[in-house]
């Protein structure tokens, strides 16, 4: 159809049609850079698929791309012997012109400060959980929080309520809920309950998939923060992520009690340590659940390693949950560092 179209629009349409006829096609996905400096664009979220595309190293260098960037571009048809189609042209990076993001700051160079802008949890008259969190351990943008929970104390419900509160009270925040080693039905429930990205690696997937997805999620969050955005990552759970690293990482030879390899605790610490409030705009908030009283010595060792790393802790009480008192928050053991910056 050519009626009413300008010459430039017609030329563009002819170019696109000819490119498609030759086998070129569009792609949009998240970039993951490999150790050999080439990259892969994941076309379907954070998971590997047959539609993933190869990105040559020279394109990554010339455009100064980083893992976690969302790339839009066109693919050339795969040649004989190629596993997958290759990226021929970059159209946008993170929704912007590639030239605009060439000089963006590095995440590690940004100045971290204490959280000073609150993320209110209370919304409406029925948000008892949100009100309790606001009083006991307020959350701010850039918080590094641990939700410490024994089994069956309502941890998943509280995480869900936190996600719902953030999407209602702070719609400008980019919300990512990361579920590691979870049951598939809980993933579906979370997808239907919250407005935000739900990224899951279920318990029937290998440990190296858990670690790969977690690293890609945190890199994606860093790319948003570098451009001045606010991100909240809700992780369920840091204990299972550490277990996955313990299985997937090569053995260092130094084994702690409970069978935990000492080298396996560094990557999840790096994940949690990425949370920070940036001085001149932007923040990365991480709220991670940690399991206790599971009867596993490994879980106990993992929790002890992470106990002092957060600046906010919300502890759930099994005795309250057994008496059907919800939310089962322990007000004495819970709290936030420098909470005076978050309370009016």
What are these regions (language model features)?
Residues 14, 33-35, 43-45, 75, ...:
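Flexible glycine-/small-residue-rich
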Residues 3-8, 24-27, 45, 80-84, ...:
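Conserved phosphate/pyrophosphate-binding and hydrolysis machinery centered on Walker-type P-loop NTPases
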Residues 1-21:
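Basic helix-extension-helix modules of the SAP/HeH family
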Residues 20-73:
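S1/OB-fold single-stranded RNA-binding interface
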Residues 23-27, 128-132, 217-222, 271:
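Phosphate-interacting basic helix/loop segments used at nucleotide- and nucleic-acid interfaces
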Residues 154, 162-344:
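P-loop NTPase catalytic core
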Residues 16-24, 95-99:
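Short, charged/polar, Gly/Pro-enriched secondary-structure boundary elements
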